[in-house]
Amino acid sequence: VAFYFSDGDGGEERITYAELQRASRRIAGEMLRRGLVGHRALLMFPPGLEFVKAFYGCLYAGVVAVPAFTPRRNRNVQRLQAISDDAEASVALTVADVRDRAVGMLDETPTLQTLDWLAVDELVGDPGDSDAMPTMRPDQLAVLQYTSGSTGSPKGVMLSHGNIMYNVMAIVYSFESTQTGLGITWLPTYHDMGLVGGVLKPLYFGRPNVLMSPMVFLQKPVRWLRAITKYRATVSGGPNFAYDLCTQKITDEEMEGLDLRSWQVAFNGAEPIRAATLADFCQRFASVGFREEAFFPCYGMAE
């Protein structure tokens, strides 16, 4: 198994490496058929495995991936248009449900209207011919990663194939002690920590990863720690606020059944790290096997 997608309450989907390769190449083949090599693709997916298939489909096809969020009828549609305009996107990759719901919102966003919308879950047929896939160089653009835009318009950062490989290699080197383990992330894949740590690093590492929706964690933080317990995860983490949320929201009753002894790397980054947060989390969860030395403060693309 390459990736799991957990609903946080016991349900899961899974995809093997072979299935992921076939699905990604099928998407790549369709983009090659449409002549999209070198173009920018806006990726707008709900949490799940379809994003992973589409993202690797872009890498196969030599299409620049632009991870983004799904459109909603509020300010976020305007932010999507700003990203699409800046990236000069020509195609939108998504699933049929999101595409159909987006139709009524596009009147205010002429740029999004002109995109070639491709629902990857409707594609059928054989995977694309591997001989037709372009050969990529390390210096070629792979991803346009956009900032959150919390202080203004989102800004795109150009990440080459070489940039990404070097970053992933550095993470793997740092997490060397967890080579036999499995990871879990609830972080959104359109942010760099969720994309690199949750989608790219696991495949390079050759270890499975469990994906969860951010809302699954935010609505009930104990689901994160229950997933670590269930899957015996060795690597998982998030921004500082996630550890505060666990300490503050998880009740004594919810603590029952947790077992965090497998957790070897609890990374913490993407925002300021507070010593009090680490101390409080350790004190709260030591009784269920969390070890202080598991904490791994880090910084990456966001910083």
Residue spans of the language-model regions?
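Conserved S/T- and glycine-rich ATP-binding loop of Class I adenylate-forming
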Residues: 41, 58, 92, 141, ...
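Conserved AMP-binding/adenylate-forming core of the ANL superfamily
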Residues: 3-56, 72-81, 133-135, 156-162
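ATP-dependent adenylate-forming carboxylate-activation enzymes
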Residues: 45-49, 63-83, 96-98, 207-228
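A short helix-loop-beta submotif of the ANL/AMP-binding
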Residues: 48-71, 82-91, 181-182, 200-210, ...
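Conserved AMP-binding/adenylation subdomain of ANL enzymes
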Residues: 165-182, 189-234, 249-253
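AMP-dependent adenylate-forming
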Residues: 1-15, 142-144, 151, 300
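Conserved pre-ATP/AMP-binding loop-to-beta segment of ANL
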Residues: 117-118, 122, 126-146, 152-153, ...
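Conserved adenylate-forming
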Residues: 77, 85, 97, 105-119, ...
